[in-house]
């Protein structure tokens, strides 16, 4: 375990993330430009695909970080049976949900019920599939729909804000089931689908297209929002949410509806819109 990961056990997660949020939304020219230039240089951010390629044109660091792409920069897989990759990033893990458990790393796993905050909500995904995608600081930070779905419910599950980088994934037990997260439940033509937006250290927020800022929230109680009857339908490949810094999205699918794309494996670099799985 790295020193940084060890320190995250004792660091004041909330305070650091609140400070990161204040900096991310600062419109002071010197502050925002220093942040943009530092992150661009350190992580090799490529702005050539951005709708706004000039790093000095962004009013805040957050605007830079959640930047839109040029039209056509990402194209969905042409196969109508393809469920799409929800984001740019890297596959952390993917595979079957076995005995209700989701694989995190060697010797590490957690239950779908822990992740979703609800045994009943997890039941339809038993023996189904999961894919965990890590968005690094250099990546496009908007999350899109793998398949067309009608929003049924969101569940905010309070928790810690550990780093979700590779070393933390290997060493922090049940990491994704311990961090603060927003669970988005959708109804689709094949049944339920869940997209879980996992918060992390220095992540200053998670926003959805239907409700705005969802994370951070304060308190230690699970919060549910019922969207049944609201008619919020998001089409396949449509934007659903964005991270205000790098983090992780986990997609859950029920059993018997799809096969994962055979070219994918842990550590594979992926792009929004490529095939994640194909309907059976």
From Swiss-Prot:
Listed cofactors: pyruvate
Active site feature: 88, 144, 247
GO terms for biological process, alphabetical: phosphatidylethanolamine biosynthetic process
Modification Pyruvic acid (Ser), positions: 247
Keywords of the record: Cell membrane, Decarboxylase, Lipid biosynthesis, Lipid metabolism, Lyase, Membrane, Phospholipid biosynthesis, Phospholipid metabolism, Pyruvate, Zymogen
Cofactor stoichiometry and binding remark: Binds 1 pyruvoyl group covalently per subunit.
Top-level taxon of origin: Bacteria
GO molecular function: phosphatidylserine decarboxylase activity
EC number, UniProt record: 4.1.1.65
Site note Cleavage (non-hydrolytic), residues: 246-247
Predominant location category: membrane
Keyword Iron-sulfur among record annotations: no
InterPro entries per UniProt: PS_Dcarbxylase, PSD-B, PSD_type1_pro
NCBIfam families assigned to the protein according to its UniProt record, in alphabetical order: PS_decarb
Record function comment: Catalyzes the formation of phosphatidylethanolamine (PtdEtn) from phosphatidylserine (PtdSer).
Family, as annotated: Belongs to the phosphatidylserine decarboxylase family. PSD-B subfamily. Prokaryotic type I sub-subfamily.
Protein name, UniProt field: Phosphatidylserine decarboxylase proenzyme
Species annotation: Xanthomonas euvesicatoria pv. vesicatoria (strain 85-10)
Gene giving rise to this polypeptide: psd
